[in-house]
Every structure is written in C-alpha cells, then in structure tokens.
Amino acid sequence: MNTPWTHTTVLLNEAVEALLSGSTAATGTYVDATFGRGGHARAILARLAPEGRLIAFDKDAEAVAEAARISDARFSIRHQGFRSLGELPDASVAGVLMDLGVSSPQIDNPVRGFSFRFDGPLDMRMDTTRGESVADWLATAELQQIAEVIRDYGEERFAVQIAKAIVARRQERGAISTTSELAELVAGTVKTREPGQNPATRTFQAFRIFINAELEELQQALEASLSVLQPGGRLAVISFHSLEDRIVKQFIARHSKEVYDRRAPFAAPKAMKLRALERIKPSDAEVHGNPRSRSAILRVAERTQEV
C-alpha cells in the first residue's frame, strides 16, 4: 500500500511494454512527457540500448529535482509542461508516454494544497513558480465562472450551490485560503453523499484542472505528438478520470480513420495518422495494492506511415 510521500507508478509494466513495442534494447529517442517521480522513466531507461535516449518533461520543480538523481547520459529533463513537446524535431521520436494527473507526493504534501485530506494553503499549482493559486483566483472570480468551472471540470451537479456558497463566504468573512475551509464549505453545501467519496472530491478536481489548464495542455500535447512521432512510433497515455480519457479516446479515434474532403468528393482521402492498438486497465492485484490506480486507463496508438 502507498504511504504518504511515496509514489507507486500505475500500469508500470504495461505502459513501458506498449511504449517500447516489446523491445528489450530500444535504440530510439523516447519521451516521458510527465516525469513525476520517475517510475516510468527508470523502467524505460532499463530497457534502452546504449544509443537510446529518453527526454522527460515536467513543470513541477520537485519532479525536476528528483530527475537530477538519475545519473545516466541517455537521460535529460526539461522544466516545462508537456505542451512543449512540439519543440522537438518532427518525426524524431520513437515513443511518447503521458501519465496524467497528480502524483502521490503532490497529493500527500499539505503545502501543495491538492487534497481535502490535509489542511494547507489552497494552491494546487503544478508549477509553483508561476501563475495564480486557487485561493488567489477564488478571491476575485465571478460566481458564474466559479460555477462553470465546477460543473465543466468536476462534473458536479451542485456546482451553482457550491459557487454561491463560496461567494457568500467571501463577502461575509473573506476569501477561502485553505483546503480545510473549502472542504468544509462544500460538505456543508452538498447534502447528498456518493458512497465512498468525499463531497469535496469533484470541486477539488475541478479547481485543479482549471488552475493548471490541464485539459487544454493535454489537447496541445496530443496534437504535438503527431508531429514528433516517427512512423511506427507509439503513443501511450494513462488517464485517471472521464474528462481526460474522453479527450484521448476521441483524439485517437479522429486520427485513426481516413478523412474525406466534402468539397472534393472525388479526391483521394487523407490517410489516417494513427492506428489504435490497446485499451488497458489495471489488474485486480494492482488495484488491491494501489487503490489510486483503480480509475486508470491506458490507451495505446501507433503512428502510421503518413507524416
């Protein structure tokens, strides 16, 4: 089981196997687009040939510091979000791995403000060196915007009620500044309970996704992968909630079929850019050992010859 400040990599073997196409001595350049605490990266390096390369991305300074512990000339990391994937040369990469969401050390560190389980500043930024925190945003955000964020990114049916409570609290006692304050406010507003779920779960998810522009960055990174992947290169994406998975699923589906131009019905169709391969869920044993893996879905696709 996980303990605070540790991280168990989800779908470790399945993701690396899919990324490397079963190779035990891969020679190409691979990308770990979300380094986190390096579980996937270390497993990839263990299966790279001496001439292989691994480029990692992460916007979290703590993740970059962890990456500095890897002493391997084949490895490099960039302190950037994975939307910067497109800065790599076209058709230069043999595989891209994206492990979406928040790592256990981020969730379990009260200072980061990601979890309602710990009292801490209401921050939630992946990159604490830039941008505004959730607390800063809530101090001035309009009721309608707050409600839309909770509804769209948290899929919360009580979004309007929660937004009204946040604004009322701000007007009466000042803005919310801690995770406990937000969790208690939501618990007092949402009267129904989903079995096994804290009533603040959806609101915390919504604010984290919004403040980090996670879905927009995911869409940009997926599009960039089409450019940087070489023919036969693999795209492997692990998602943890329906919003992420829907984007990944639709992206792969959209690029896995020939496209016809309605304005030129007799013209040859544009070739598909991806070939969908697998959809993998964690085993029962993995979920038992790491409950945080239960919602994970790994989708795998392969770049076609069309570049």
Swiss-Prot record:
E.C. designation(s): 2.1.1.199
Entry keyword set: Cytoplasm, Methyltransferase, rRNA processing, S-adenosyl-L-methionine, Transferase
Domain of life: Bacteria
GO annotation terms (biological process): rRNA base methylation
InterPro entries named in the record: RsmH, SAM-dep_MeTrfase_MraW_recog, SAM-dependent_MTases_sf
Binding site for S-adenosyl-L-methionine: 38-40, 58, 82, 99, 106
Pfam families assigned: Methyltransf_5 (PF01795)
Main location: cytoplasm
GO molecular function: rRNA (cytosine-N4-)-methyltransferase activity
Localization per record: Cytoplasm
Reactions it catalyzes: cytidine(1402) in 16S rRNA + S-adenosyl-L-methionine = N(4)-methylcytidine(1402) in 16S rRNA + S-adenosyl-L-homocysteine + H(+)
Function: Specifically methylates the N4 position of cytidine in position 1402 (C1402) of 16S rRNA.
Record NCBIfam families: 16S rRNA (cytosine(1402)-N(4))-methyltransferase RsmH (TIGR00006)
Similarity-based family: Belongs to the methyltransferase superfamily. RsmH family.
Name listed for the protein in its UniProt record: Ribosomal RNA small subunit methyltransferase H
Lineage of origin: Bacteria, Pseudomonadati, Pseudomonadota, Betaproteobacteria, Burkholderiales
Gene from which this protein is expressed: rsmH
